[in-house]
Amino acid sequence: AHLSSLIGEGILKTLKEENLWDIYENLEIPLSRVLAYMERNGVLISRERLEELGRELDENLRGIEREIYNLAGMVFNLNSPKQLATVLFERLKLPPIKKTKTGYSTDVEVLTELSKLHPLPAKILEYRELFKIKSTYVEGLKKYIQSDGRIRPTFSQTTTATGRLSCLNPNLQNIPARGTWGKKVRECFIAPEGYKIVSFDYSQIELRILAHLSGDENLREVFYRNGDVHMETAKTLFGKDEISDDERRVAKTVNFGIIYGISPYGLSRSIGVDQDTAREMIKRYYERYPKVKNGRRR
């Protein structure tokens, strides 16, 4: 206790010297109390739903396994990159795309590209997705369920440099949200009797701040009329008024990527296009919102 008090005196002095005392006293300390409350309460989860989901995943995994073995013409260890490489590049004669120190790569990028040539790589990707959900979320979450049916993770407000919260044991901030199986995992989290689970989120808060700080009239105008900024950006990127859900998702990636300085290469990887197309998208974005570009330079 004595040593802690000595360390504390030095830290408090530094906080004041760095003009951080106000943030510490009025933001970090109140937040720590909220997080302590969250950790103490935890979240209720249905073990029965998890186990039912596990059985459903097992059945689907077995079906995918059979399809893979039929396509490959042989049985092999699906979790062995070396055996998979042998099947893809020697047995099926598919072209190797990337080489590592241990041999030809069978990572997501390679399998996605090879899926254009043969149905087997797509099935491997599907198998991996379901296997991860089963092992990481279904089996992983069960280990943390306490006697009262709740999971109590640990939240940290000082781990990330950006100020975002981190969560571990388990990481409940990383529960999948998209796709049929991701939604089924989320459905395992339940409310106590007499309560409901509700979700609140700031509406495009980062882009609103960008509109305010950059002063870009076009971006501000979208928010002034309560428009859908991702839809408006998509119209600019694709040069048309009728926008699909997939095109809106691309625009969303561009909108948030621009804030953090995404490169043509980074954007091309994120949305699955070539670098020239990504570069043209960034160019069109800045033509629509010119003050965003000027603001980023400042």
Question: What residues fall within each predicted segment?
Answer:
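Conserved "right-hand" nucleotidyltransferase catalytic core of DNA-directed polymerases
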Residues: 1-180, 196, 203-206, 264, ...
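A short, structure-level motif marking secondary-structure boundaries and short turns
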Residues: 19-20, 50, 215-217, 248-250
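Substrate-binding beta-hairpin/strand module that engages nucleic acids
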Residues: 25, 230, 245
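Short, amphipathic alpha-helical "recognition" segments used to contact nucleic acids or chromatin
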Residues: 250-260
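Short, leucine-enriched amphipathic alpha-helices that occur as contiguous helical runs
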Residues: 28-31, 247-252
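Positions in alpha-helical segments
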Residues: 109, 232, 252-253, 265
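Function-dense linear segments that define catalytic or interfacial modules
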Residues: 1, 157-242
